[in-house]
Amino acid sequence: MEDYKLLQLETATVDAQAPPLPTKTVPVFAPPLSTPPQPNELVYTKRRRTKRKAKCRCLFFTMGMFALGVLMTTAILVSTFILTVPIGALRTAPCPAETFGLGDECVRPVLLNASSNTRNISGVGAVCEEYSEMAASNGTAGLIMSLLDCLNVGDSESVMNKLNLDDTQLAYCNVPSFAECYTKGFGVCYAARPLSPLGELIYKARQALRLDHIIPFPR
């Protein structure tokens, strides 16, 4: 019994002399406390926002002025083109059938009955009205018919084919073998060459702007 008590005392003495074991501490991270901004920081933030807004407004203003300038320049160019384009440049459409182009006009040679009163200019005008065209003077008609006769010398069909007159009575009457053509006269009708699609657009634009009385545009 005494030996057991001595053993307990020795064990307690050793335990008292042993160094304490290290303990592990776990750090606890706490969220930082929000500190109120200083007065200098508030002023700097407000100035930075003001500068951003000013830059955005300046950019929008510059882009708007650029777009406005482009639109105004386009409008000026289009208006100048509509007002100053020559009429001859817009009459580029081909002439109708049984006519041929002569400058800005489409010429239509027509045959007339010699016994009727269609040899004078008023009679030719009545024939031309059927085609919504005007009658050329006798001198002009004679020059045009003489020109056709000169072109047809040696080959009676090639010129008529080129002038889009191959299926007309005038083409047959240029051949001397048709005796019935001797009893007929001739006349010349003419009209302005048709407008091209661009010419039609410009003509309608001038009508919409009511500029016909300032800048004549014969239809």
UniProtKB/Swiss-Prot annotation:
Coiled coil: none annotated. Glycans are attached at N113, N120, N138. The keyword Oxidoreductase does not apply. Its main location: virion. The chain crosses the membrane at residues 58-78. Belongs to the herpesviridae HHV-1 UL45 family. This is Envelope protein UL45 homolog. It comes from Equine herpesvirus 1 (strain Ab4p). The lineage of its organism: Viruses, Duplodnaviria, Heunggongvirae, Peploviricota, Herviviricetes.
